[in-house]
Amino acid sequence: MKRIFGAKNNKEPPPSIQDASDRINKRGDSVEEKVKRLDAELCKYKDQIKRTRPGPALEAIKARAMRVLKQKKMYEGQRDMLYNQTFNLDQVSFAAEGLKDAQQTMTALKSANKELKGMMKTVKIQDIDNLQDDMMDLMDESSEIQETLGRSYNVPDDIDEDDLLGELDALEADMGNETEADGVPSYLQPDKEPDLNDELNLPSAPMGHTGAPPGRAQAEDEWGLPAVPRASLRG
């Protein structure tokens, strides 16, 4: 059947905007190279015209320079036209990319909208309000429990301002009595070491010689006690 009717030709895909823009830019660059080459020739002719004396030779150089200038103008026109086409293609490409971005944005928004609707079905405002109310009740109960546990025992609640002022005056008087001696409260004064003699209730040692009766001198030993006569020790 293919031999009779022929095979169907596969159509090539149309060129994209980027392909067309690249091809036109390539042509524009080629034309730009030609313009630069003609500029170099014109510079040579300019130098020749300066060095050549008036006459047929000068006219011939001017004619060639005029022909090169016409070619340059033609190539410049083609170059500008190609660059304008490239600019138009760039604008179209920018618009197409913007539409693609808009399509992707719309697709993402639709997907997000669908997902949010599914999530909102499981989350209700009334449930959130009820949960908040329950949390507030629990916090109030917790505060009451803490206050109950922190309540003091055997503390009178009927203390008024007069009682407070009387207590402060009594404290001030006590502190004044403690600081009268050395200007230091008793709780800041150093502790005194107890006297051993006071604790044992022993009599104090004699500080001097006891006076003997008149007319009789009594001998004493080295500790201040009456000396024992030696005769009594022998007997």
UniProtKB/Swiss-Prot annotation:
GO aspect biological process, one term: protein transport
Subcellular location: Endosome, Multivesicular body membrane
Compositionally biased tracts (Basic and acidic residues): 20-30
Gene3D superfamilies for the chain: 6.10.250.1710
Domain of life: Eukaryota
A GO-annotated cellular component: multivesicular body membrane
InterPro entries membership: Snf7_fam
Region (Disordered) location: 1-30, 174-235
Protein topology in the membrane: Peripheral membrane protein
Keywords: Coiled coil, Endosome, Membrane, Protein transport, Transport
Main location group: membrane
Coiled coil: 99-148
Pfam families xrefs: Snf7
Transmembrane segments annotated in the record for this chain: none
Function: Probable peripherally associated component of the endosomal sorting required for transport complex III (ESCRT-III) which is involved in multivesicular bodies (MVBs) formation and sorting of endosomal cargo proteins into MVBs.
Similarity remark: Belongs to the SNF7 family.
Protein name: Vacuolar protein sorting-associated protein 60.2
